[in-house]
């Protein structure tokens, strides 16, 4: 006979959004169970020890975290009590060029502007002006909107037009990131620098109605932070917080199906046959295809919504080919001799010399071709956090954007993995010549197909969990008419990155979903979620 458990709510998937959602509802008095199919919680926060050399740690997915300590859920849930620590390297990013020059993103905007001025004084002036003009836009609109359920655009536009800061936001809303970049910056290397940083956040260069994201990125800053003890330490931190608050979680036991009866979600069946009844709700932290097509089943959906779910688009331009190295010594870049300040950078970009190369990569990814030329971003985590490698040694990695559906079949990655790894490493060596065979102790790589195999939430290797374009962003995420974290199945909610505000380690989907679920259940909210409509009314 199957084991039977009873809870008020079940959260499917112990990625950071799932755990955040569970925490808010558990602290509201509900008895919650979080179910995770992998051996450990964390989702995209996964980190592994090198399989050949113990003591070398590799951050498998997420590593560049931004402003986490100031986010509402971090503060509300008191995560500082559970031992988390972040390093804040400066510069946050260095883009190396073969002529030994570089572009850098520093905490001090004037230092960033100074590096841009070496390539184009006009671009430097433009960058500083965008940064100045968009400071209030980010603080008063973009950031608050991240942590609130999205408004319908017609309603939002009416409210935004009443304030100067709102009108500035709207000015570039109907453009694409590429249009903004090419209209405002003239130097091809500056264009490549800004464009690539946007792409590495999951932006589509030609994504409709997302042009505003580039000035927002400039004003917000690209100053990534590193979690001490690898990114998985944040997952551990969240798990400790759950336990501290009496919230249960299960690892290494995924959900086989969601129980639906008379149009209502009533619980889940786990892979081992355990039945978990959910008195109030089920919240899914996994993507819509996995949630609705596999776990709910199309027989429990009307035909129109079933088509919406099956048609959810995954990005063709966010999958990566990851190269991880265990080293005797850190990579030493060709720019260091003339510019020693680059040594302390967190993110390093190599191989990308012009904006045209970035555009070519988009075409290659979308047509399923190997990139014409490798160019990558990565880091040397052990330089900033000594716990990630043995004393005197180093870890480093590089990520190359690459197509999932290579030559029409993702299985082709199993055939060309070794060849592409060599090309990627060869390009890296042009910029860090000390990456010799003698220096490299161990190598590891992961193709876009490997990423999907490891985490089935990342369909097609898409760590953004859904293409981020105008018709699949904000009030259209995951689908038009279904942006409020609810679903057609009563009692079933979405709380993952397929919802607003999308991928990356923001916690926004989990935070926002918790507010919606709590409201539907009539709970007394112990936190203060933002009413974005009321907020914009007051802003005007």
Language model regions located:
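Extreme N-terminal leader/targeting segments of oxidoreductases
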Residues: 1-9, 27-28, 473, 523-540
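N-terminal glycine-rich phosphate/pyrophosphate-binding loop and immediately adjacent elements
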Residues: 3-143
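Rossmann-like flavin
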Residues: 98-207
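A glycine-rich dinucleotide-binding beta-alpha-beta segment and adjacent secondary-structure elements
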Residues: 187-201, 371-379, 434-500
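Helical element adjacent to the flavin cofactor pocket in flavoenzyme catalytic cores
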Residues: 214-265, 269
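Mid-domain catalytic core of redox enzymes
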Residues: 226, 256-389
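Flavin-binding catalytic cores
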Residues: 330-331, 365-372, 413-453
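A conserved FAD-binding loop/helix module that cradles the flavin
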Residues: 497-518
